[in-house]
Amino acid sequence: MLVTLFASCTKTENGGETDVENNENTENNEANLSSGELILFDEAMKLVEEKVGAKEEDKLSVMKIGGVDVTYSQYRYYYVNYSKNFANYSGYDWQNYDDLVESFNSAIDEALEMESLIVKLSREKGIGFTEEEFDTNIMSAYDSLIEQYGDDYEATFEENYNITQYYLLENEILYQLYNKIQQYLYLEGGERFDDIKKTTLDFFNDNNYVRVKHILVSFPEVTEGEELTEEQKAETYTKAKEILDKANAGEDFDELIDEFNEDPGAASNPDGYYFNDTSTFTQAFKDASFALKEGEISDLVESSYGYHIIKRLPIDDEDIVYTNEYYDNMIEDFRDFIAEERGKMEKTELDEALVQPAVDEANAYINELKQAHDEAIAAEEAEAAEDAENAEEAE
């Protein structure tokens, strides 16, 4: 999974770091489903070069994956940072363990293959940025980022993140294109949108799901150890009955929900609840829901929470795109799609001579850790020997 470097490099007010979601509005996200002129990857990188320049290492190709150049800056960023992470968390001698070396190599391969695939797919499918998106989410965001670091921002990024300014911007472009590829495939009108809707609809139908909205009129809270009084229960019933009468008289059910519903979970389920008989809803709620026909409204249904007024709704493909099941199916399908596309990409041999400086840089860091470790051990041994000698003299 890609992570935006703009977020990981962003300082909080107390000098730390924070994860920042890169949110774009739906109108902009859907730009790639229309025929408007967009800034595609190659044009975006020309604009990046105009803004921050490009070092030789930013253009130096060390291998090709799927016909896409992997540059030295790109390879170095992952190789050096991953080496440091492995050394910091698994020990300076991690390279002596085959399983760790295999994990390291797999992580490098996955990162480079993913970035190459993003470039390849965005080129093939014409996925890019509107001018406003590019100016706001890339260029202006970059300006805001480096403003936090002052005049020495370039050296700071190099020292802390092992990254050039050119590749920093390229990485952010790739991160946002990754999200846009997903939107291109799964937003309404996307290549895989109808397939995922059908998969989700089939799942609901095959597993006997219902969809309902409800109005909960809650019992009043009672202090621990006390019980709800008959008077409190009657007052709640009367209020719920008045709302039920409004619903049966034809008043808009959604408007009644907005006005009277006391279910805290309703806000995160605006299109209703989808469930089958294995769900954790109370049995009375489930029984009443399954007894209804589509469009029918229940009588008052009592549970430990209060009184429910339930309306059963149809399960159709227009609404299921907002369900957790649709999202889960989309994510699973996207993973499969990415894995399949990665498997199709051919790779040229890595030019090991060209990347040797990055390897040396990573090894230098590991050697520093080893030296610090050895010096600490030596100091401990010397202290122990001195303590032993002093103990003998004391005797």
Sequence positions of predicted segments:
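N-terminal targeting/tethering segments
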Residues: 24-165
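A mature extracytoplasmic/lumenal domain signature
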Residues: 67, 74-76, 133, 216-221, ...
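PPIase-associated folding chaperone regions across multiple families
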Residues: 12-21, 25-57, 105, 154-232, ...
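C-terminal motif of bacterial Sec signal peptides marking the signal peptidase cleavage site
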Residues: 4-8
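Sec/Tat-exported extracytoplasmic proteins
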Residues: 79, 83-86, 108, 112-116, ...
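Soluble non-cytosolic domains of exported or imported proteins
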Residues: 69-73, 95-116, 128-132, 167-176, ...
